[in-house]
């Protein structure tokens, strides 16, 4: 196992900068997830750690060794790709031991490692099968096993679940989490799926247009996003945003005016906030309240009702706001499309963002953070 450090790492192709001044500390045995939209540079960052992409400037360390000029095969990393890339004419055991065979490992060593990893991944009964006889989840486990038998110090996974159906993704997500707990290896995982990031990670790195937007534990990013981008990316359905204007400030409070002219005091850091400033109020769909238990409410027309059984998601068009708000309740809510529906805003669950997108620090203490 080993730690990974990136110091001012930049990657550019000509004038196009895809990763800019990346600084990260990944601790020994940590499970870190790089998450962000397509094109944010997360896979490029992983490939630089693997040695598959050169670093334009900055330094990469694995353990105590600077790795910028070290070939991929000598870095002690193992990588699992979105594609299984299994040899169809080889058995599961032969696929898993292929890298060791090329490296000149003895047959006894190969057999021992393959059998050990097969037990961990529940593949022992499948070692003689060919890939065509395996399910998608089994093939992905073989690809993971092929990397594990090489005993890498750092384990890299580039969107390994993207080719699987929804049910299989959930199953494999659980298996990868169990695998990390059992092995204690340093793992770096790339995904665009924020649910995977929230459920797997010890620490999440949110990337936006080649920069690190925020690094933190899953609940920290959920409850205390550093900016509007992170707030909108982490959480599903995503956070609602309302245009507001600052009408007053006090110590550790900011008063804003909502689109319906109601005013609400928010428990957020007020330093640097100017009266009259245009800002954005954010609130998650699951934090909105029924209007009868809230002091500050918004009313609008129901556009869409999504009944999911265990919860209801209601899309509401609020006058003077171009986009819908989404209200989420963990129950069945019987309401017709076109009906008038009111929702409440609890001040302690609201977020406030400046015009540049940065967040005013929330002062309400959330559990588990």
UniProtKB/Swiss-Prot annotation:
| Main localization (coarse) | membrane
Origin, by domain of life? Bacteria
- UniProt membrane topology term: Peripheral membrane protein
Q: What class of enzyme is it?
A: translocase
Task: Please tell me, according to the UniProt entry, what happens when changing residue 165 to N.
Answer: Loss of transport. No effect on ATP-binding activity but decrease in ATP hydrolysis. Retains repressor activity
**Catalysis performed (reactions):** D-maltose(out) + ATP + H2O = D-maltose(in) + ADP + phosphate + H(+)
What else does the entry mention about this protein?
Answer: Target for inducer exclusion, mediated by the unphosphorylated enzyme III of the phosphotransferase system for glucose and resulting in the inhibition of maltose transport.
The protein's name is: Maltose/maltodextrin import ATP-binding protein MalK
Please tell me the species this chain comes from. Answer: Salmonella typhimurium (strain LT2 / SGSC1412 / ATCC 700720)
Which gene does this sequence derive from? malK
């Amino acid at each position: 196992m080993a730690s990974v450090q990136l110091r001012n790492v930049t990657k550019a192709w000509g004038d196009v900068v895809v990763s800019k001044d990346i600084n990260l500390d990944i601790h020994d045995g940590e499970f870190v997830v790089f998450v962000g939209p397509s094109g944010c540079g997360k896979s490029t960052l992983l490939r630089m750690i693997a040695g598959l992409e050169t670093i334009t400037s900055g330094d990469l360390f694995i353990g105590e060794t600077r790795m910028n000029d070290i070939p991929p095969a000598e870095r002690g990393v193992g990588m699992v790709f979105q594609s299984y890339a299994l040899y169809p004419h080889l058995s599961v055991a032969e696929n898993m031991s292929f890298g060791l065979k090329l490296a000149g490992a003895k047959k006894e060593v190969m057999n021992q490692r393959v059998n050990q990893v097969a037990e961990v991944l529940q593949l022992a009964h499948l070692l003689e099968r060919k890939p065509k006889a395996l399910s998608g989840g089994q093939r992905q486990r073989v690809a993971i096993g092929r990397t594990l038998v090489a005993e890498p110090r750092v384990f890299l996974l580039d969107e390994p679940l993207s080719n699987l159906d929804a049910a299989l993704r959930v199953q494999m997500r659980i298996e990868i989490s169990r695998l990390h707990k059992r092995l204690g290896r340093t793992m770096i995982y790339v995904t665009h799926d924020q649910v995977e990031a929230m459920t797997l990670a010890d620490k999440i790195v949110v990337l936006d247009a080649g920069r690190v937007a925020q690094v933190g534990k899953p609940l920290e990013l959920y409850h205390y996003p550093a900016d509007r981008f992170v707030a909108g990316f982490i959480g599903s359905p995503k956070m609602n945003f309302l245009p507001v204007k600052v009408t007053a400030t006090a110590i550790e409070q900011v008063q804003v005016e909502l689109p319906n002219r109601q005013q609400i005091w928010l428990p957020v850091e007020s330093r640097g906030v100017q009266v009259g400033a245009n800002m954005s109020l954010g609130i998650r769909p699951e934090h909105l309240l029924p209007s009868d238990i809230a002091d500050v409410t918004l009313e609008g027309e129901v556009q869409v009702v999504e009944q999911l059984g265990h919860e209801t998601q209601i899309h509401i068009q609020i006058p003077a706001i171009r986009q819908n708000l989404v209200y989420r309740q963990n129950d069945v809510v019987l309401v017709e499309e076109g009906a008038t529906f009111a929702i409440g805003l609890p001040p302690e669950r609201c977020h406030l963002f400046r015009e540049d997108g940065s967040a005013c620090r929330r002062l309400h203490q959330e559990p588990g953070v």
